[in-house]
Amino acid sequence: MKFALFSVLVLMLIATFVAADDCPRICTSDYTPVCGTPSGGRRSANRTFANQCGLDSHNCLNKGDTYDKLHDGECK
């Protein structure tokens, strides 16, 4: 009985790690800005992200509000 309970707990733990998203949640504080433009032809302003990791993290966590990299540097 103990082995069965232990096995179930291990499987649940593995499933939790597999189901976890792979979004970067912690980015460095290096300020190497990138300008992003809304994906999919949305009509909203370009947005400056602190770095590429910030843009990637935003896109991963906000599937309906993604940005494509327009260029390095701040948006004008």
Curated annotation (Swiss-Prot):
Signal peptide: 1-21
GO molecular function, one term: toxin activity
Biological process annotations from GO: vasodilation
Superkingdom per UniProt: Eukaryota
Pfam family, one: Kazal_1
Keyword Protein transport listed: no
Stretches assigned to the Kazal-like domain: 22-76
Annotated Gene Ontology cellular component terms: extracellular region
Role description: Vasodilator protein that inhibits vasoconstriction of isolated rat femoral artery induced by phenylephrine. Since platelet aggregation and vasoconstriction are key hemostatic responses, particularly in small wounds, this protein likely participates in the antihemostatic responses during blood feeding. Blocks L-type calcium channels (Cav1/CACNA1) in left ventricular myocytes isolated from rat hearts.
Designated name of the protein: Vasotab-TY3
Species of the source: Tabanus yao (Horsefly)
